[in-house]
A protein has these predicted regions:
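Short secondary-structure junctions
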Residues: 19-29, 71-74
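Short edge beta-strands and adjacent turn/loop segments
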Residues: 25-42
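A short interface-forming secondary-structure element
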Residues: 45-57
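Short, non-transmembrane amphipathic alpha-helical segments
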Residues: 54-75
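Short, internal active-site loops enriched in acidic
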Residues: 37-39, 49, 85-89
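Catalytic "initiation/cleavage/transfer" segments centered on a nucleophilic residue
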Residues: 65, 73-127
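N-terminal presequence-like segments and adjacent domain-start helices
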Residues: 1-13
Length: 127
């Protein structure tokens, strides 16, 4: 199946979501849109130490509560995937790009990163 293209509306929606998480003081360390080989669509991948301190269900609950407070609805919330900061994918992203001055807007694709094959990606933040 052909992968859907990333459009500016998705990029803006991802930026608004990240802004909402920043306002909720979640200190997101990694945020990017990723079209991963194991899924057939785009996912907004986020990682934060605050999520790591919770079990996955509570982490998604915190995410949803933070987005709800910012006015996001189930209809306007993009598909989000929370990964631990220790996940091999996140660790490899941080190893490769954390010292890069500006990663916002960087495109990734056609490569293995950690244990995941990234078909395409749009980066907001890697710290």
């Amino acid at each position: 199946m052909d992968k859907a293209e990333m459009v500016s509306l998705d990029i803006e929606r991802g930026a608004a979501l990240l802004d909402a998480l920043d306002r909720a003081k979640l200190k997101v360390g990694v945020a990017l849109w990723a079209h991963l080989a194991e899924y057939d669509d785009w996912r907004l991948v986020v990682s934060a130490r605050r999520f790591d301190s919770l079990d996955l269900r509570d982490a998604y609950g915190l995410l949803i509560d933070s987005l709800d407070a910012a006015g996001f609805t189930p209809r306007t919330t993009p598909p989000v995937m929370i990964l631990p900061m220790a996940d091999p994918f996140v660790r490899e992203l941080r190893r490769r790009f954390a010292k890069t001055k500006s990663v916002e807007g960087m495109r990734l694709g056609g490569q293995m990163i950690g244990d995941r094959f990234v078909q395409d990606g749009y980066v907001y933040r890697i710290e």
